[in-house]
């Protein structure tokens, strides 16, 4: 039986830059794109060419000089404005001129958000979504529709939330991304809704979670279990407020826990180096207790734990750290015990044993 593959859309350059303190120069962005391509993600959402001149320059450079092996660049934009034809919308024109073959378009999936925030009638919001998807599709772009506030909108008015997806699909969208924009939806609710949407639509479903309730990774995995075939997230979980789904957690969970293919074979071992490289580009300290990629993820301090993990790795390690490019650390402390000390000593004196006089004396 063939291994199920999950698409990965990295949005570090779009959603990630909304995190407090994260600023990338154009050179940084190009380095980040190359690092993500080397890691092997499917898509890189590289920014908004209409609202950010730096992003427009990135797409110009990519069009002329950037040759990617694994990833495809996507440009981010909004639906057409209310009361305007799609062909007259400057933001949509910028997407076409970016040279990107994929447009990630965000539109409101909540009836109250459409009415109270965008200021348009619910019917006009649906027309904006459909017109935008159709215009871009007819001009040669693939459209990924980001249904903003989808889970909140579904709780509020399920029929209307689903109608926004129907509008996108009628316009030719090739992915329907369900967004937990406020980051407060429980994984069980995400599973239930994604299952219903995936069963209803022939267009593949994607999941886009924020971490405001500490549930972004769990919600993402629940969505994949329910039928989502694309995951959207950021390296190190960078994103506005509390961040986005952290691909440094999601990627190994998908591959090592769920048995799915998310990256080219063997590329998961690049994850730790990629996470550190991007944290350096962002000028942010790495969270050393981050699962999988932090220096402390496989650090052992207690004497009994060190003794146990040296005898059997799975005593206190849920995976081999090498699978994600990390390594085990045995910490010397007042609670470390003889096993930790001996392991460190044997690096310089291989002949020592637990019973050696020098070991006992130390």
Protein language model regions, located:
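Metal-centered catalytic cores of metalloenzymes
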Residues: 1-2, 165, 192-199, 221-224, ...
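A mid-to-C-terminal "edge-of-domain" accessory segment
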Residues: 5-6, 12, 252, 258-362
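A glycine-rich helix N-cap at a beta->alpha junction
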Residues: 69-76
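Histidine-centered catalytic micro-motifs
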Residues: 205-212, 219, 233
């Amino acid at each position: 039986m063939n291994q199920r593959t999950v698409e990965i859309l990295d949005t570090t350059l779009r959603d990630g830059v909304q995190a407090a303190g994260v600023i990338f120069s154009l050179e940084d962005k190009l380095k980040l794109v190359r690092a993500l391509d080397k890691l092997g993600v499917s898509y890189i959402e590289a920014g908004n060419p209409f609202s950010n001149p730096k992003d427009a320059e990135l797409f110009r450079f990519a069009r002329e000089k950037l040759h990617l092996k694994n990833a495809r660049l996507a440009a981010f934009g909004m639906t057409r404005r209310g009361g305007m034809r799609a062909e007259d919308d400057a933001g949509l024109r910028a997407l076409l001129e970016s040279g990107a073959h994929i447009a990630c378009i965000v539109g409101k999936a909540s009836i109250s958000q459409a009415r109270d925030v965008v200021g348009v009638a619910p019917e006009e919001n649906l027309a904006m979504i459909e017109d935008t998807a159709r215009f871009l599709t007819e001009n040669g772009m693939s459209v990924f529709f980001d249904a903003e506030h989808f889970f909140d909108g579904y709780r509020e008015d399920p029929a209307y939330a689903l109608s926004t997806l129907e509008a996108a699909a009628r316009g030719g969208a090739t992915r329907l991304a369900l967004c937990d924009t406020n980051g407060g939806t429980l994984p069980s609710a995400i599973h239930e809704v994604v299952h219903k949407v995936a069963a209803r639509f022939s267009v593949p479903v994607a999941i886009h979670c924020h971490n405001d309730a500490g549930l972004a990774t769990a919600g993402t995995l629940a969505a994949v279990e329910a039928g989502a075939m694309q995951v959207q997230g950021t390296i190190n979980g960078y994103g506005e407020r509390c961040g986005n789904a952290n691909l440094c957690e999601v990627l190994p969970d998908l591959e090592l826990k769920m048995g799915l293919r998310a990256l080219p074979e063997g590329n998961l071992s690049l994850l730790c180096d990629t996470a550190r490289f991007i944290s350096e580009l962002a000028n942010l300290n790495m969270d050393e207790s981050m699962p999988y990629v932090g220096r402390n993820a496989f650090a052992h301090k207690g004497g009994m734990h060190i003794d146990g993990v040296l005898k059997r790795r799975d005593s206190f390690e849920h995976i081999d750290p090498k699978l994600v490019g990390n390594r085990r650390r045995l910490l010397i402390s007042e609670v470390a015990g003889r096993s930790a000390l001996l392991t460190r000593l044997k690096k310089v004196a291989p002949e020592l044993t637990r019973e050696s006089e020098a070991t006992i004396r130390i």
